Amino acid sequence: MCKEIYDLIAKELYRQQSTIELIASENFTSKAVMLAQGSILTNKYAEGYINKRYYGGCEFIDEVESMAIDRVKKLFKCNYANVQPHSGSQANQAVFLALLKPGDTILAMDLNSGGHLTHGAKPNISGKFFNAVHYCVNKDSYLIDYNEVEMLAQQHKPKLIIVGYSAYSRKINFATFKEIADKVGAYLLADIAHIAGLVATEYHSSPIPYAHIVTSTTHKTLRGPRGGLILSNDESISKKINSAVFPGMQGGPLMHVIAAKAIAFSEALMPQYKEYINQVMLNAKVLAKLLQDRGYNILTGGTDNHMLLVDLRGKNITGQEAEYLLDAAGITCNKQVMPFDTTSPTITSGIRLGTPACTTRGFKENEFITVGKYIADILDNIAIIKSAKKNEGITITEIEKSLNSVITRTKHHVQELCNCFPIYTN
């Protein structure tokens, strides 16, 4: 490996080791997953499917893909699986290609309410090729408004209804979505990219009995390599999906990644993985309560999964400011648009916090109480400084200078805590 790349990898390893990772979509894979992903399987082209390849020399590749498929079907208790999508976005695009025609109507959650770009957002290909209609959360509870979903479905008669989100902290009633889809003759797609680990361990109800098709990423709560996944119990739809993935969307599958997926699925079938997901959820609840007790507005009043959404509109703090200054203190999170947010997506009015990565490191409730205090201390000080300068205006850089002692002290405490929980030993 060249020195330049080696040095950058070393720096990134140090960053991951010495900071608190609270981005809900990130996690730390096992060494076994990384070993497979860095294996000689990357050398092999394998266009096509098991026993139906367009290249020779795929006998062992077929076994790898077969193993991944068998394991994920067991994990999610389904009949059909495609493990070839390179990402969750491409998994969703394959579903659109398989089931829709350009101009068809799709019904999905609005981006500001917690939906995903690939669910018909205007900048995304899904919003350019299809007529996207969006439902929102309830303005008072910030929960899914099932009545609005049904009303819009009856009004617009979508070909596809999408359920599953990137910023929603409560449980989803897949059965209700199935009833709505059936009333209007729509396909139902469940995108469980964020909650796949909870579904696999039965801490969240499974969409498999209700949705025509289920997509997911293989990282996030599944703790595997970055990649995509498509599941179904419908044989005819699964055949359409296979054709949409290859040759419709992709050429050769990434066999080194599929091997890593197989390992991650095997790890998720182990009893300790269920214990891990339970701890992820406990940690999220503890963090949400701590921040609530410190006066911060947690959307929906709490969480049922691995994430929480902190609405900072009442504190006169932007998501951009919170993300930047928490990062300066060694706490990594992401700014997040809030429901009915009027600020730019590059500014936002809140932050999203997730517990999977730090739980993988071994953090439990006590550690997350400590983390919550660090976060609240930083945010409290931002609010104080901005309040004192409210008539003059103040930049993030100026806030950072004023917070220098608090940031320095917090960063030191963060590093001490992280040193007690190494990501990888040896």
From Swiss-Prot:
The keyword Amino-acid biosynthesis applies. CDD domains: SHMT. It catalyses: (6R)-5,10-methylene-5,6,7,8-tetrahydrofolate + glycine + H2O = (6S)-5,6,7,8-tetrahydrofolate + L-serine. Gene3D superfamilies: Aspartate Aminotransferase, domain 1, Type I PLP-dependent aspartate aminotransferase-like (Major domain). (6S)-5,6,7,8-tetrahydrofolate binds at L111, G115, H116, L117. One of its GO terms (cellular component) is cytosol. Signal peptide: none annotated. The keyword Flavoprotein does not apply. It comes from the Bacteria. Pfam families: SHMT. One of its GO terms (biological process) is tetrahydrofolate interconversion. GO terms for molecular function: glycine hydroxymethyltransferase activity; pyridoxal phosphate binding. The modification N6-(pyridoxal phosphate)lysine is found at K220. Pathway: One-carbon metabolism; tetrahydrofolate interconversion; Amino-acid biosynthesis; glycine biosynthesis; glycine from L-serine: step 1/1. Its cofactor is pyridoxal 5'-phosphate. The record marks H219 as: Plays an important role in substrate specificity. Keywords: Amino-acid biosynthesis, Cytoplasm, One-carbon metabolism, Pyridoxal phosphate, Transferase. It is found in: Cytoplasm. Its EC number is 2.1.2.1. Belongs to the SHMT family. NCBIfam families: PRK00011.1 (NF000586). Catalyzes the reversible interconversion of serine and glycine with tetrahydrofolate (THF) serving as the one-carbon carrier. This reaction serves as the major source of one-carbon groups required for the biosynthesis of purines, thymidylate, methionine, and other important biomolecules. Also exhibits THF-independent aldolase activity toward beta-hydroxyamino acids, producing glycine and aldehydes, via a retro-aldol mechanism. PANTHER family: SERINE HYDROXYMETHYLTRANSFERASE, SERINE HYDROXYMETHYLTRANSFERASE 1. This is Serine hydroxymethyltransferase. The gene is glyA.
